[in-house]
Amino acid sequence: MAGNRSTDIKVHCSFCGKSQDEVKKIIAGNNVFICNECVLLSQEIIKEELAEEVLADLTEVPKPKELLDVLNQYVVGQDRAKRALAVAVYNHYKRISFSESRDEEEVELQKSNILMIGPTGSGKTFLAQTLAKSLNVPFAIADATSLTEAGYVGEDVENILLKLIQAADYNVERAERGIIYVDEIDKIAKKGENVSITRDVSGEGVQQALLKIIEGTVASVPPQGGRKHPNQEMIQIDTKNILFIVGGAFDGIEEIVKQRLGEKIIGFGQNSRKIDEDASYMQEIISDDIQKFGLIPEFIGRLPVVAALEQLNIDDLIQILTVPKNALVKQYQALLSYDGVELSFDQDALEAIAAKAIERKTGARGLRSIIEETMLDIMFEIPSQEDVVKVRITKESVNGDAKPILETA
């Protein structure tokens, strides 16, 4: 507590030696005293050291091949997209680590944010999560459909930054090197190429608001979220080194690509390549197609890296179920092993699960719910049936035509 100035005994700070008369407050500990000035100084020292630790971590960024190896352990397929992401992420953090020591005369490297285009359940969110985890940087996910421009009911774009700050345990320096994934970005596309005379609360206005933080600015973030209020204390965060990955399904964009490629054939006649109807038009997307879909040119310009993900087929989904380190089949096998039960899936059972996910158009994200439906009764009964040692999931049990096969001791 503060020293009493009315006594004859003068208390001095154990660190700087100043007396209680020379400072505003002295705090007493166990045979030690510290003044308010030394408290502030120590806070600054700790802050600087933490910032240096963050920068030190970034000097050891995994190379693109190493990042790809990590992604391959957890993500099935999407090889082109994974390579594009690995290169973009490596270049981003290399840019940060070298910009701190860059001379003014040297070339200034601009930030390369990423746009991922692919159908629902193709792995967009999981790819971003896996990258952030492998780099040990803060990560936040936001849904573009919940955002509105300032002055309208909804969530301010600055609240995206608050999620990242919270993921960094309110360490702003660490958050400034984090990754933000904004999903459903295609849902804030303009509803056509003609500019509407009415206010576009959730479309172009949100793109403009996102543009500011994506390209790099010092933003003021309410520490408790919500709308900003006058005289409210704010957290200042510089977004110039935050990597933004945005993703969306962009349903219908392949028709825009087909139209563009078809027009090219008409324009150049037989010298132009013939469009293969079975080809993946998603790999042919260019910025003009994205603009025609409804994203504004300025926004597209801040997303120079475009990674197109393909629709997952049955074989891809079966691999997702069984191959990765954290594959769903392995997870459920581990769950039942805690009860002393061995779990197995027939090959045609895996095919049935994958077929259901494709039928429901949920892709990889729908696999868990299908397994849960199949195994609900088993997971309810097994803990009480101590004589059961094996459970076998068949195609019939996945389709609801029979129960899983149990084997007892």
From Swiss-Prot:
Enumerate the residues binding ATP.
Answer: P119, T120, G121, S122, G123, K124, T125, F126
Q: Which InterPro entries match?
A: AAA+_ATPase, ATP-dep_Clp_protease_ClpX, ATPase_AAA_core, Clp_ATPase_C, Clp_protease_ATP-bd_su_ClpX, ClpX_bact, P-loop_NTPase, Znf_CppX_C4
Give every ClpX-type ZB domain span.
Answer: 1-54
| Biological process terms in GO annotation | cell division; proteolysis involved in protein catabolic process
**Keywords for this protein:** ATP-binding, Chaperone, Metal-binding, Nucleotide-binding, Zinc
Q: Which domain of life is it from?
A: Bacteria
Keyword Chaperone in the entry? The reply is: yes
* The keyword Oxidoreductase is annotated on this UniProt entry: no
Q: Name one GO cellular component term.
A: HslUV protease complex
Q: Which molecular function GO terms apply here?
A: ATP binding; ATP hydrolysis activity; ATP-dependent protein folding chaperone; protein dimerization activity; unfolded protein binding; zinc ion binding
The cross-references to Gene3D superfamilies, in alphabetical order and at most eight, read: 1.10.8.60, ClpX chaperone, C4-type zinc finger domain, P-loop containing nucleotide triphosphate hydrolases
Binding locations of Zn(2+): C13, C16, C35, C38
What does the sequence similarity comment in the record state about its family?
Answer: Belongs to the ClpX chaperone family.
**Subunit composition and interactions:** Component of the ClpX-ClpP complex. Forms a hexameric ring that, in the presence of ATP, binds to fourteen ClpP subunits assembled into a disk-like structure with a central cavity, resembling the structure of eukaryotic proteasomes.
Q: What does this protein do?
A: ATP-dependent specificity component of the Clp protease. It directs the protease to specific substrates. Can perform chaperone functions in the absence of ClpP.
Q: Give the protein name, as stated in the record.
A: ATP-dependent Clp protease ATP-binding subunit ClpX
Organism equals Streptococcus uberis (strain ATCC BAA-854 / 0140J)
